[in-house]
């Protein structure tokens, strides 16, 4: 019973009969199949389990569907199996020829004509601006106009005929210019960034140096600022610098702001509020002095000349900086100043009163006999 081949009655036998028992040269002759023990696999089978043969055959030949060929006619398309067929297998064969990607002639002509119009637009605008467009034309002007029309016509024909060439050249040029602009913008942005970082580092180093500097450096810088202010005064006096007197007055009277920033980098942050308070108090005192001075001059119908302005500016500058220094050294001094002034005036009046009362007391303490003797003499 062994090594006997029982052929399967299926479509496989029909296929083998049609092929006239052809042998696959790559896989060799067909092995014998033993149906009893199943030791030998079916021919050219890739399955390890013979029981899966039926499933493979069912999948191969699709027993669940009709094996009859579809009815092809002119008005009916064949029914395809979307699940078994791979996508995009149906391709149309266009045998009519290759498509032409070139632009139509009218579009070429229109684009070329537009280019010539744009090229001539500046000249037309200039002639319209000069009011010389088709006005007072002689033989020479009309000859030039006709020659220019001929040149434009030839240019139109040339641009239309060589449209692909010059359009590609223009496109490449525009792309190149755009890339150049982009690279330039990136380079400028990097330059600005590097410059800003360098300036920030310089400012930081300067601020740290001022913060760690001693008080004498602050005084030296302050003295330099005073020299600059008085240089402005001298140049304004001799006419080398035509500045408004009020501008000089306001600028130099609040010059203590420089000291404010110098002290800000040297002192802790919490003193900034005190600095602003002292500065505004000094400005208030200076404003009061200016208002009183102007009021008195207007009351007595007097005018301040250039020398008077210089005296006023110098006085305000000295008084303002002195008050600011005093306020920074003794916090709250300006607030206590009215009280101190009142106390000083009261002390002065009290001393004057005591002196007057002392003189009266001395006169009252003279004996009567001495007064009579003096009267007799």
UniProtKB/Swiss-Prot annotation:
It comes from the Eukaryota. Residues 11-29 have a biased composition (Basic and acidic residues). Disruption phenotype: Abnormal spore maturation in presence of cw9-encoded poison. Sensitises cells to cw9-encoded poison; simultaneous disruption of cw27 enhances sensitivity. Pfam families: WTF. Residues 1-49, 64-100 are annotated as: Disordered. The keyword Transmembrane applies. GO terms for biological process: meiotic drive. The keyword Zinc does not apply. Keywords: Cytoplasm, Endoplasmic reticulum, Membrane, Toxin, Transmembrane, Transmembrane helix, Vacuole. The chain crosses the membrane at residues 105-125, 142-162, 172-192, 218-238, 252-272, 276-296, 306-326. GO terms for cellular component: ascus epiplasm; endoplasmic reticulum membrane; vacuolar membrane. Homomer. Forms protein aggregates. The two isoforms can interact with each other and with themselves. High sequence similarity is required for their interaction. Belongs to the WTF family. This is Meiotic driver cw9. The gene is cw9.
């Amino acid at each position: 019973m062994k090594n006997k081949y029982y052929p399967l009655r299926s479509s496989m036998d029909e296929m083998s009969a049609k092929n006239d028992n052809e042998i696959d040269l790559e896989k060799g002759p067909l092995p014998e199949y033993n149906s009893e023990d199943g030791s030998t696999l079916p021919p050219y089978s890739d399955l390890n389990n013979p029981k899966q043969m039926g499933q493979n055959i069912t999948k191969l030949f699709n027993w669940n569907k009709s094996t009859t060929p579809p009815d092809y006619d002119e008005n009916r398309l064949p029914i395809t199996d979307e699940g078994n067929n791979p996508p995009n297998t149906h391709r149309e064969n266009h045998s009519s020829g290759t498509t032409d990607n070139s632009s139509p002639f009218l579009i070429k002509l229109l684009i070329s004509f537009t280019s010539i119009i744009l090229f001539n637009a500046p000249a037309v605008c200039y002639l319209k601006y000069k009011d010389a467009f088709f006005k007072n034309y002689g033989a020479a002007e009309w000859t030039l106009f006709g020659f220019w029309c001929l040149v434009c016509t030839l240019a139109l024909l040339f641009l239309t005929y060589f449209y692909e060439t010059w359009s590609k050249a223009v496109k490449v040029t525009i792309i190149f210019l755009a890339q150049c602009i982009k690279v330039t913008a990136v380079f400028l942005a990097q330059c600005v960034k590097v410059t800003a970082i360098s300036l920030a580092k310089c400012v930081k180093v300067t601020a740290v140096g001022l913060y760690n500097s001693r008080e004498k450096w602050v005084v030296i810088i302050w003295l330099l600022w005073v020299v600059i202010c008085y240089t402005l005064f001298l140049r304004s006096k001799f006419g080398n610098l035509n500045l408004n007197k009020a501008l000089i007055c306001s600028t130099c009277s609040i010059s203590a702001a420089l000291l404010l920033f110098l002290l800000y980098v040297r002192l802790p942050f919490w003193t900034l509020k005190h600095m602003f308070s002292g500065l505004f108090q000094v400005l208030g005192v200076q404003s009061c002095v200016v208002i009183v001075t102007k009021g008195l001059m207007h009351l007595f119908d007097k005018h301040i000349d250039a020398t008077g302005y210089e005296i006023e500016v110098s006085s305000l500058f000295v008084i303002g900086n002195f008050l600011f220094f005093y306020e920074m050294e003794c916090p709250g001094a300006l607030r206590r100043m009215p009280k101190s002034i009142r106390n000083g005036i009261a002390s002065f009046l009290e001393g004057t009163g005591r002196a007057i009362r002392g003189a009266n007391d001395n006169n009252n303490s003279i004996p009567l006999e001495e007064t009579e003797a003096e009267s007799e003499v």
